[in-house]
């Protein structure tokens, strides 16, 4: 699972997801990509599940890039615990995703295989996504 090696503080405030993504909104490495259409949180487990779905479908052909990183901790209180008494302990890591962010990129495979692989990955993610290619951008 992806997680930061070191952090200055164990816990963070939740924050608000407003606006669209300016950085990371265009294809940089691959020919095809998966772009987010709405904002949301994606956990490190979901990132890994989508990556495995892509690599298995392309049968280890081509190259896959993950264009985001889970750098925000989320906390959880134990089961059957009353409210209050402070914030829960850190449970895992997730990434804050804004609309327009390119999540995954693929290069070295035909468009049909890339479209199928990224569609499989999209089913593993909690936010709606769209297939993009370099020809759409040009």
UniProtKB/Swiss-Prot annotation:
Molecular-function GO terms, alphabetical: rRNA binding; structural constituent of ribosome; tRNA binding
Protein's UniProt keywords contain RNA-binding: yes
GO biological process: translation
Gene Ontology annotations for the cellular component aspect, listed alphabetically: cytosolic large ribosomal subunit
Record keywords, A-Z: Ribonucleoprotein, Ribosomal protein, RNA-binding, rRNA-binding, tRNA-binding
InterPro entries the record matches: Ribosomal_uL16, Ribosomal_uL16_bact-type, Ribosomal_uL16_CS, Ribosomal_uL16_dom, Ribosomal_uL16_sf
Keyword flag Ribonucleoprotein: yes
NCBIfam families the UniProt entry points to: rplP_bact
Subunit structure and binding partners: Part of the 50S ribosomal subunit.
Record function comment: Binds 23S rRNA and is also seen to make contacts with the A and possibly P site tRNAs.
HAMAP family noted in UniProt: Ribosomal_uL16 (MF_01342)
Family per similarity comment: Belongs to the universal ribosomal protein uL16 family.
Protein name: Large ribosomal subunit protein uL16
Species in which this protein is naturally found: Syntrophobacter fumaroxidans (strain DSM 10017 / MPOB)
Lineage: Bacteria, Pseudomonadati, Thermodesulfobacteriota, Syntrophobacteria, Syntrophobacterales
Gene: rplP
């Amino acid at each position: 699972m992806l997680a930061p090696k070191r952090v200055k503080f164990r816990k963070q405030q939740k924050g608000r997801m407003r606006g669209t993504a300016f950085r990371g909104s265009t294809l940089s490495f691959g020919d095809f990509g998966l772009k987010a259409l709405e904002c949301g949180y994606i956990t490190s487990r979901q990132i890994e599940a989508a990556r495995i779905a892509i690599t298995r479908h392309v049968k280890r052909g081509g190259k896959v890039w993950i264009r985001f990183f889970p750098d925000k901790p989320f906390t959880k209180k134990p089961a059957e615990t009353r409210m209050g008494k402070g914030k829960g302990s850190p449970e895992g890591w997730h990434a804050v995703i804004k609309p327009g962010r390119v999540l995954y990129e693929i290069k070295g495979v035909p468009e049909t295989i890339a479209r199928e692989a990224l569609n499989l990955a999209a089913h593993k993610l909690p936010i709606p996504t769209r297939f993009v290619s370099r020809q759409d951008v040009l």
